[in-house]
Amino acid sequence: MAQAFETNFWKDEQLRKVWDDIVPGEPRKTIPYVLTLEAIQRYCRAVGDLHPLYFDEAYARKSRYGGLIAPPSIHILLMFSCTPADDWMRSPGTINAGQSWSYNIPARPGDTITLQARALDKFIKKERLFVIHDNVFFNQHGEVICSGRGWTIRPK
């Protein structure tokens, strides 16, 4: 069974950092996540990506990857799986204003994923509160799976 994470973004909302509390350069608190085959396949079904690299062991074994992998977009699931319920990124009303990702190696079933994340900058534009943030996902061997920079508009 895949590890569960809190999907009620309103729960403990008052405990999260608000705009004034976010310090550029300060690391965000993160938690390791064991990526299971079940989680990969549930994610793939949810987004409609049924490629055999994610479902068919025999097919995947013959591929250049030598086994089942997760799709590159799995970082979306990992972002929330690797952050605790009180992380400011989970604040209700947060808007994704854009992102740019680089993919190095695929995540695999059984990988223990860790996230290094921090706010890089914050600014106000047209009365909106923006945060630029940096995220790097690693597997249990310290290899970078993917890294990215995102822009969010904060609710407060």
Segments predicted by a language model, with ranges:
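HotDog/MaoC-like acyl-thioester-processing domains
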Residues: M1-D20, Y103-K156
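Short alpha-helix capping/helix-loop boundary micro-motifs
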Residues: G98-S102
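Hot-dog-fold acyl-thioester-processing enzymes
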Residues: A2-N96
